[in-house]
């Protein structure tokens, strides 16, 4: 059984949703990013979604765009992202899913990129701007190297589209709870229970919900119906608000992540 499947199975056995933390690799630099990953992992997160910094992150809101910019300005490269994963693997077996864009995968060479990710310790690949009907090469590379494919379902996705996405996915299905980009919002969408149920009609894979979830109460609401909850901007803000003090960054991340994890209990 894969690390991803084991993580969801453990959460289910504990009567809670899995908590998935998003951080941008290399934000604000390699060493602080590694410490940030350690802080959220030790706070009890079930999966780590690691954003691969990109100069044109179209699906990301301002918070995550700035995180990618900080990482790139610090000199973060694709090789450094793989190195970061290897360093995480020195102290944790938490599942790691790359959150990336197709240009980055293509520029490296699809098979070479997926192989390098697997060798570093990556468990899954979410290529945000790659629809399943255009993903044959990436999917084949993932199958060949034992990396699980994650796809996004949007609020506007019709049933036939959901069915196609469900057929292509192997790790979990990521439902984005609103149209547009990532970022903090005041309340979660009211249609999440219906959307999750609609996806489950097409797959037995775990269904996670992300985009805009930022506090413990919102986590609690989503955890009541979904298999997993993704929080990104609220964690990335812990870095942005404490730049210049790695100690404050890790302390704040540990506190915020721990509070959010507590909201996953059903």
Curated annotation (Swiss-Prot):
On whether Amino-acid biosynthesis is a keyword of this UniProt record, the answer is yes
Keywords, A to Z, come to:
Amino-acid biosynthesis, Aromatic amino acid biosynthesis, Lyase, Tryptophan biosynthesis
EC number(s) in its UniProt entry? 4.2.1.20
A GO CC annotation given for this chain: cytosol
Cite the annotated pathway: Amino-acid biosynthesis; L-tryptophan biosynthesis; L-tryptophan from chorismate: step 5/5
Q: Which reaction does it catalyse?
A: (1S,2R)-1-C-(indol-3-yl)glycerol 3-phosphate + L-serine = D-glyceraldehyde 3-phosphate + L-tryptophan + H2O
**Top enzyme class of this protein?**
lyase
Organism domain of life = Bacteria
Extract the Pfam families matched here: Trp_syntA
Residue positions of the active site:
49, 60
InterPro entries named among the record's database cross-references:
Aldolase_TIM (IPR013785), RibuloseP-bd_barrel (IPR011060), Trp_synthase_alpha_AS (IPR018204), Trp_synthase_suA (IPR002028)
Q: Does the keyword DNA damage apply?
A: no
One GO molecular-function annotation for this sequence? tryptophan synthase activity
The UniProt function text for this chain reads: The alpha subunit is responsible for the aldol cleavage of indoleglycerol phosphate to indole and glyceraldehyde 3-phosphate.
Family (UniProt): Belongs to the TrpA family.
UniProt name for this protein:
Tryptophan synthase alpha chain
Which species expresses this protein natively?
Opitutus terrae (strain DSM 11246 / JCM 15787 / PB90-1)
Quote the gene name from the UniProt entry: trpA
């Amino acid at each position: 059984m894969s690390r991803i499947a084991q993580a969801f199975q453990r959460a289910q056995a504990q009567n809670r949703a899995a908590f998935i933390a998003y951080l941008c690799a290399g934000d604000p630099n390699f060493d602080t990013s590694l410490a940030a990953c350690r802080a959220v992992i030790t706070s009890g997160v079930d999966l780590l979604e690691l954003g691969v910094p990109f100069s044109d992150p179209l699906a990301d809101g301002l918070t995550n765009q700035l995180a990618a910019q900080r990482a790139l300005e610090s000199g973060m490269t694709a090789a450094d992202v793989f190195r970061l994963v290897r360093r995480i693997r020195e102290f944790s077996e938490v599942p790691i899913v790359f959150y990336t864009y197709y240009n980055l995968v293509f520029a490296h060479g699809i098979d070479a990129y997926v192989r390098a990710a697997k060798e570093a310790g990556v468990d899954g690949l979410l290529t945000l701007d790659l629809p399943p009907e255009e993903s044959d090469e990436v999917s084949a590379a993932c199958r060949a190297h034992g990396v699980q494919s994650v796809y996004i379902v949007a609020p506007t996705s019709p049933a036939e589209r959901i069915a196609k996405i469900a057929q292509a996915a192997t790790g979990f299905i990521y439902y984005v709870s609103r149209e547009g980009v990532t970022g903090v919002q005041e309340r979660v969408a009211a249609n999440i229970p219906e959307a999750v149920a609609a996806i489950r009609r097409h797959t037995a894979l775990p269904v996670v919900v992300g985009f805009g979830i930022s506090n413990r109460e919102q986590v609690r609401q989503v955890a009541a119906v979904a298999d997993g909850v993704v929080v990104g901007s609220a964690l990335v803000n812990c870095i942005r608000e404490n730049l210049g003090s790695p100690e404050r960054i890790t302390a704040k991340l540990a506190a915020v992540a721990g509070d959010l994890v507590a909201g996953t209990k059903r």
